Amino acid sequence: KTMNRLRDLREDADLNQTRVAQFLGMSQTGYSKYETGENDIPTQVLIKLAGFYKTSTDYILGISDRRDPQ
């Protein structure tokens, strides 16, 4: 579920993996492993992504279906 949310958020923002990876200061390959579920997302990266997409960490993790942060 997390992988789908990451991809959906990125696509809804009309961004490619390279752009998000640049924001995070990592390679596109490294970021793509988060989207595919090959690697777990470190907490600090999760927090950065939530801020970047203006959503909650719970939404990205699939704990909540509420997209807007509370």
PLM regions: where:
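DNA major-groove recognition helix of helix-turn-helix/homeodomain DNA-binding modules
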Residues: G25, Q44-Y59
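Conserved amphipathic alpha-helical interaction elements at protein-protein interfaces in regulatory
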Residues: D8, D12, F52-T55, R66
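Recognition helix of helix-turn-helix/homeodomain-like DNA-binding domains
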Residues: G25-D40
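Short, charged recognition helix plus adjacent turn
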Residues: D12, K33, Q44, L61-Q70
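Conserved hydrophobic/aromatic packing and binding residues within compact polymer-binding modules
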Residues: L6, V20-A21, Y31-Y34, I60
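Short basic helix-loop element that most often maps to the first helix and adjoining turn
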Residues: N4-F23, K48
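Hydrophobic side chains within well-formed alpha-helices
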Residues: T2, L6, S56-T57
